[in-house]
Swiss-Prot record:
SUPFAM superfamilies: Ribosomal protein S7. The gene is rps7. Coiled coil: none annotated. GO terms for biological process: translation. This is Small ribosomal subunit protein uS7. Gene3D superfamilies: Ribosomal protein S7 domain (1.10.455.10). The keyword Nucleotide-binding does not apply. CDD domains: uS7_Eukaryote (cd14867). Part of the 30S ribosomal subunit. One of the primary rRNA binding proteins, it binds directly to 16S rRNA where it nucleates assembly of the head domain of the 30S subunit. Is located at the subunit interface close to the decoding center. Belongs to the universal ribosomal protein uS7 family.
């Protein structure tokens, strides 16, 4: 006989350690940063056929998927999983906070609000500043965080786990040492000049 167990009573944590009850301060990103409690962040691409399906993937898995960029880590999800797991341990030791909260803060700070698009009118190309969609803001923030970490650890004795932890912590503190913060400011500066 199977007992009815309430899902809310189950205490599922990411990697068996980290609670996903964190605060998203940016109201526009709240819907697109999924904080679902899941022990193993691997949905297996079940979102693919739904519109805006990737917004229902846990944010930790989206970070893992972004680590599998073409190049050295292409397709190696277990390697990316272990990188993020170790990174979260380093973040917890350095900051004393929940690493998922630090990651969410880093995404909020590194997400650009405005960018430039090309408009062709009468054979002349104009660059026009446009607002960035919330889904794209999260995508760009994750991409820039991962790119900054991989650039910092490439041809360098520093492991990628440490580089990613430093990148996330710097972005969470809105520090200019973070590549993601610098790229965001550059994108917004270009958009401001082409208004």
């Amino acid at each position: 006989m199977v007992e009815n167990i309430e899902v809310s009573n189950l205490n599922v944590k990411v990697f068996g350690k980290w609670d996903t009850k964190v605060e998203v301060r940016d109201p526009s990103l709240k819907k697109y940063i999924d904080l679902m409690s899941i022990y193993l962040p691997h949905t297996g691409g079940r979102h693919e056929h739904r519109r805006f399906g990737k917004s229902r993937i846990p944010i930790v898995e989206r970070l893992i998927n972004n680590l599998m960029r073409p190049g050295r880590n292409k397709g190696k999800k277990m390697l990316a999983y272990n990188i993020v797991k170790t990174t979260f341990d380093i973040i917890a030791v350095k900051t004393g906070q929940n690493p998922i909260q630090v990651l969410v803060r880093a995404i909020e700070n590194a997400a650009p609000r405005e960018e430039v698009t090309r408009i062709m009118y009468g054979g002349i190309v104009y660059y026009v500043a446009v607002d960035v969609a919330p889904q794209r803001r999260v995508d760009l923030a994750l991409r820039h965080l991962v790119t900054g970490a991989s650039e910092a650890s490439f041809n360098n004795p520093k492991p990628i786990e440490e580089a990613l932890a430093e990148e996330i912590i710097a972005a969470a503190n809105n520090d200019n040492k973070s590549v993601a913060i610098r790229k965001k400011e550059e994108i917004e500066r270009i958009a401001l000049s082409s208004r």
